[in-house]
Structure formats: C-alpha cells, structure tokens
UniProtKB/Swiss-Prot annotation:
Gene: CYP17A1
Native source species: Papio cynocephalus (Yellow baboon)
Main location: endoplasmic reticulum
Cofactor(s) required, per the database record: heme
Name of the protein described by the UniProt record: Steroid 17-alpha-hydroxylase/17,20 lyase
Lineage: Eukaryota, Metazoa, Chordata, Craniata, Vertebrata
Keyword Lipid metabolism: yes
Matching PANTHER family: STEROID 17-ALPHA-HYDROXYLASE/17,20 LYASE, STEROID 17-ALPHA-HYDROXYLASE_17,20 LYASE
Record comment: activity regulation: Regulated predominantly by intracellular cAMP levels. The 17,20-lyase activity is stimulated by cytochrome b5, which acts as an allosteric effector increasing the Vmax of the lyase activity.
Amino acid sequence: MWELVALLLLTLAYLFWPKRRCPGAKYPKSLLSLPLVGSLPFLPRHGHMHNNFFKLQKKYGPIYSVRMGTKTTVIVGHHQLAKEVLIKKGKDFSGRPQVTTLDILSNNRKGIAFADYGAHWQLHRRLAMATFALFKDGDQKLEKIICQEISTLCDMLATHNGQTIDISFPVFVAITNVISLICFNISYKNGDPELKIVHNYNEGIIDSLGKESLVDLFPWLKVFPNKTLEKLKRHVKTRNDLLTKIFENYKEKFRSDSITNMLDVLMQAKMNSDNGNAGPDQDSELLSDNHILTTIGDIFGAGVETTTSVVKWIVAFLLHNPQVKKKLYEEIDQNVGFSRTPTISDRNRLLLLEATIREVLRIRPVAPMLIPHKANVDSSIGEFAVDKGTHVIINLWALHHNEKEWHQPDQFMPERFLNPAGTQLISPSLSYLPFGAGPRSCIGEILARQELFLIMAWLLQRFDLEVPDDGQLPSLEGNPKVVFLIDSFKVKIKVRQAWREAQAEGST
C-alpha cells in the first residue's frame, strides 16, 4: 500500500516539478516549492500580495521566482529590469498567461487587455489606437467631450451643496459617458436603466476577479461548483448581452463615410476585410462580432473603473492633507479664477495639481502588479535566463516605493514632482511607470491623464471638499483587486463662495 502511495507521489513530483529548458543557464533565485502546490505554502498569508512580494526582495533580490501552482512566475521589482521586460525586450515578454477567470472575462482570450500576443491582438490594439486619433480636433475633440460630462457632474454635485455624500457613482457616470461616447456615441442620462446595468455588472466583475481564486492556479478545479466563478460568468454574460444589444442597434446606423467612434472603426475594418479591401494582417476571422464586442468591452471596462478609482484616491489624499488642498485652491484661484472653466492648456499653470495627480499614481498605482506578462520565447532578464512560457509580474508597487529611488516613499509628497521653486514639473526618479510601458502599455493613458486633470481642476474650482462633520477620514489601506480600489468613503460637498459670487455677478 505505502509503496503505491510513494510511487504515486514520485510520479506527481516528476510531472509537476519545474523543468529547466537550459540546464546550464543561470536562473533567478526561487522560493521553496513543492510538487503540485508550488511555493504557495511559503508565501505570506496576510497583507497585500504586492507588498508581500516587495518585502521578499530583501531576501531574494529585485528579481526572483515563485511557483504559483504548477507555473513558474518571475517577480521583477526594479525599474531597470522592468524596462528591460516591457520595452527593450517588449516583444519577448508581450504574451499573456492563460488564466481561467480572465479567459471568461475576455470571451476566451479575445480583445486587447488579456489576449495573448499575436495577429489578433496586434490588429485590435492598432484599431483602438486609431480610434483615439479621431478625437484630436474639432467637435469630437477629447477635451470637449470630457468637459461636457464634467459640467453635468458638477451640476449634479451642486444639488448636494452642504451635504455629505459618496462621490463614487456620480464620478462613475461622468467617466462612463466619456468612454461610451468614444466607443459608440452614446451618453447616458442619470437614471437610465442601462447605466445601472453597466454599474452593476462592472462591480460584479471586479468583485469576482478580486477574490483569490485557486481555479486560476489549478484550472482543473473549474469542473467543481464554484460560486465566484458562476458570479463572474453571470456578470460577463450581462455585459455581453448589453453590448450585443447596442451593437445590433448600431449596425442599422453605420455609415462607412462617417467614422466617428470605436465601433465605426472596427465595423469599417470588418467591412473592408469582408470585401477584400484590407491588408493581409486584417483577417475577417479576427473581426467577428465576438472579437469586436470583446475589444469594446475591454476599453469600456478598463477606461471606467481605473479613472474613477484614481479620482477617489486623489480626493481621499486631499482630505488627509488639507495643507496640500489649500495650496491647490490658491493655485487655481490665481491661475484660472472664476470667469472661465479650466482647460487642458492650464496644465502648464496648475503645476501643483499635476504633481498631485502624479504622486497619487505613484503612491497608489492603479495596478500594483500590472497585468501579468508571459515569455513568448526563451529569453533573459538581466543576467538570468527566463524560459518560454514563464509568467512575469512587474511589481509596480516595489518600483514606486523603493527607498533608494524615492525619499520617504510611503509619504504623500506632491512637491517631489516639482523643482524647489515649484515652477517646473520634474521627474524625480526613473522608477515610475504608472501606465506601464512598451507594447503592452495602457493605450488610454492620454485619455486618463486628461480626465484626471480636468475633473480635479473643475471640482476644486467649484467645490470645497471637506471631511464629514463626524470627522471620519477615508481609509488609505486600499483593496487590490483588478484595480487598486479605495474603500467607500464620504466627503462633504460645499459650493465655494467665490464661485457662487462670480456666477451671480456674471448673470447680472
């Protein structure tokens, strides 16, 4: 009996023990690992994973490996090595791991965010970037779209003058409408039932993906009942059903001579491919309805929750740092005043605000470990070999909290991004990659930066953002899911007296 058990264990150890492709090569240091479960028993069980990986650097160095179940994962925690992965060898490491939950979210690895490297991903990323080029000038200028939604947001917040509210949903609505206009020229009115559907499925997906899922480490577990997986499937289906409805309705309106949004760009590419008018890289199979909807879903999902979350982080840090908030009010009053609304051109004048946004993106990065990469070929990082198929995680948290790169990295200090006189923005460290870099960098970076600047400039021009009367400050601990979320909090909204007086004077 025991002989059979021993034989079984030896067989499993042989099958699942990591095998080196290049026996003589030098590999990164590795945590202890066991057959089947890998390094899981030896990883810290409490605290945020990004911070735990950061702490492990003290023992294993800025690059090391762990066995996540049966897969080898290399953790990179230094900016030079990170840029080697993302930029210098970006093509080598531009793959995406196959993960059960993300396969569900991406309709079996379609779209952009979670699709593996290949012709499909390259095509859809190129088409998505072409879409953003549509919004550079004229009536469709990105700034104009953002400002019209922020104006509606501010009007709504003004109805809560003197009240203590959670700004999450109002900000979500504004940013959802910006993305919706970019994707398919739709802007939702407050109270629209479709808007509630978007909000609910978005929260459901993020909540499902945020739970530690053994099925991602051990895919064979998906044959067993799994409430989290079922919840994810349910919300993804809701998303897909809504996008399909919008897509089918839009097909009747599509005009190839009027390309104004992302759905137009994708549909035109599909039409050209079907008619044989496209290049060899534009296979019609890569532009099926399912492919198109998944790409729209990616842009919609990634563009909404990330920016909404960062706006809330900025407000939270300002509530904790009233001296910074006071300086921001002074900066806006002196450089913009109240006779006009802020514009993107004000970024050259509102330097402290821009520095504040950069500091929040440093101290609370949207994705503390980015989205995992995968080695497409046998390659290397620094002096270490990395085998094809190895998963690679860039620990952005480590880059942004390295004491050798940042003075007091755990302290909120927007002034670190300004010269001593406060008259010029600077880059205090190369260890700063809030939007990633290279082939897999965030394609919505320009949009996100404009949204963050304009939303905060408009809010600070019009409203006093105050700690509630009960003195309850937001928690800055955070909740790392797909996006590094901040726990719900409330802020007291008061229309600024100077703004009210300026509006009254302007109307007379």
